[in-house]
């Protein structure tokens, strides 16, 4: 009876994932309604301007249909790479490995479920080993293993059979050893040990060895079952990768402190509708030598 050894608890249920997907869809619908209101306001404003009286030779404004909704809504959003939902206060996004782009963020609960199903502790893409912090639940909060009714019946029958078998083996060994001890006393009195004594001695040795092997195998199975129960009631928290967290801080710092002045005297970029060029400051200290 083979059973998986490593299992990790704190698994998010399908209801939690479906609720998170429902919240993300609700947010998308609200965002689309807001965009439609913005487009309608823009259309009414442009029609009022055209009715106010513009010369017929003037160029007509660009059609509103040319604007896409993706240009109004933000194109880059932090989403979970497993459930493709955004993070919130209840389930924030973490950066557990060196992956970048759309694979950079993941939910703690989604990652725990993936770790349990895949039985691995490293990223399948960048092969970075996750930084984990484990702790056991209090004993009063332990949960039963998720097993089918057939598996539970097999375990109960196995335990019952093992208890009966161990009792029979111990009783048989006790009887054989007692009889053997009596024959040894009789042999010491007569000075002769008959062949039944040696036969019983061999049977006792074989029974004792078989009982030890039986106990070892069954204890090993029960130890594995105990480890499985212990792992099921263990909570594992995956921490952020130190390198990615520092990188995120450095990437966000220039966005929070924009530089509006050209302090170093570098070239200033001018953009136009048709062309864009950069002009560099002239070097007034240079001298032209005619040969």
Curated annotation (Swiss-Prot):
Residue spans of biased composition, Basic and acidic residues class: 25-39
Residue ranges of the region described as Disordered: 22-72
Example of a GO MF term: ubiquitin protein ligase activity
Keyword Kinase carried by entry: no
Enzyme Commission (EC) number: 2.3.2.27
Location(s), subcellular: Golgi apparatus membrane; Endoplasmic reticulum membrane; Cytoplasmic vesicle membrane; Lysosome membrane
Tissue distribution: Broadly expressed. Present in immature dendritic cells (at protein level).
Functional description taken from the UniProt entry: E3 ubiquitin-protein ligase that plays several important roles in innate immunity and adaptive immunity. Mediates ubiquitination of CD86 and MHC class II proteins, such as HLA-DR alpha and beta, and promotes their subsequent endocytosis and sorting to lysosomes via multivesicular bodies. Possesses a very broad antiviral activity by specifically inactivating different viral fusion proteins. Targets and ubiquitinates cytoplasmic lysine residues of viral envelope glycoproteins with single transmembrane domains leading to their lysosomal degradation.
Subunit structure comment from the entry: Interacts with CD86.
Protein's name according to its UniProt entry: E3 ubiquitin-protein ligase MARCHF8
Encoding gene, per UniProt annotation: MARCHF8
